[in-house]
Amino acid sequence: MRVVLQRSKKASVAVDGEIVGQIPFGLTLLVGITHEDTEKDATYIAEKIANLRIFEDESGKMNHSVLDVEGQVLSISQFTLYGDCRKGRRPNFMDAAKPDYAERLYDFFNEEVRKQGLHVETGKFGAMMDVSLINDGPVTLIVESK
């Protein structure tokens, strides 16, 4: 499992011009799932993200988690995170999980994030989405389970 995490001042996702998920501040997650991922990977990533200390304290040090600052999470599925661009000029997506499997694991992942005590908004799995955010910092990390 691969997640691109962005600390966000605000974020939203729209499908067909209609906002389907939005947060006032917190973390925007682009979530990629490969065919080798399991529920164990999803739980590991959910716990890691909830507890990563990437928000500043009073002295400007990254000492607070999204839980500490009472932020929210916008989670967006993105199979293209498993695009392999090493050969040719068109990405190969063979490492991305099949949609049925990926959707089930993506839903499980979001529930695991909620179990950490976070409010989670989502995009629409498999849809073309317009994502808008103000990246805070910018702080952008890649979190992987393997």
From Swiss-Prot:
Enzyme Commission number(s) from the entry: 3.1.1.96
Subcellular location: Cytoplasm
Annotated motif Gly-cisPro motif, important for rejection of L-amino acids, positions: 137-138
Any single GO CC term annotated in Swiss-Prot or TrEMBL for this entry: cytoplasm
A GO BP annotation: D-amino acid catabolic process
Protein's UniProt keywords contain Hydrolase: yes
Molecular function (Gene Ontology), one example: Gly-tRNA(Ala) deacylase activity
Reaction catalysis annotation: glycyl-tRNA(Ala) + H2O = tRNA(Ala) + glycine + H(+); a D-aminoacyl-tRNA + H2O = a tRNA + a D-alpha-amino acid + H(+)
Primary location group: cytoplasm
Source species, domain of life: Bacteria
Keyword annotations from UniProtKB, A to Z: Cytoplasm, Hydrolase, RNA-binding, tRNA-binding
Summary of subunit composition and partner proteins: Homodimer.
Functional note: An aminoacyl-tRNA editing enzyme that deacylates mischarged D-aminoacyl-tRNAs. Also deacylates mischarged glycyl-tRNA(Ala), protecting cells against glycine mischarging by AlaRS. Acts via tRNA-based rather than protein-based catalysis; rejects L-amino acids rather than detecting D-amino acids in the active site. By recycling D-aminoacyl-tRNA to D-amino acids and free tRNA molecules, this enzyme counteracts the toxicity associated with the formation of D-aminoacyl-tRNA entities in vivo and helps enforce protein L-homochirality.
HAMAP family per record: Deacylase_Dtd
Family: Belongs to the DTD family.
Domain comment as written in the entry: A Gly-cisPro motif from one monomer fits into the active site of the other monomer to allow specific chiral rejection of L-amino acids.
NCBIfam families in UniProt: D-aminoacyl-tRNA deacylase
The name this protein goes by in its record: D-aminoacyl-tRNA deacylase
Phylogenetic placement of the source organism: Bacteria, Bacillati, Bacillota, Bacilli, Bacillales
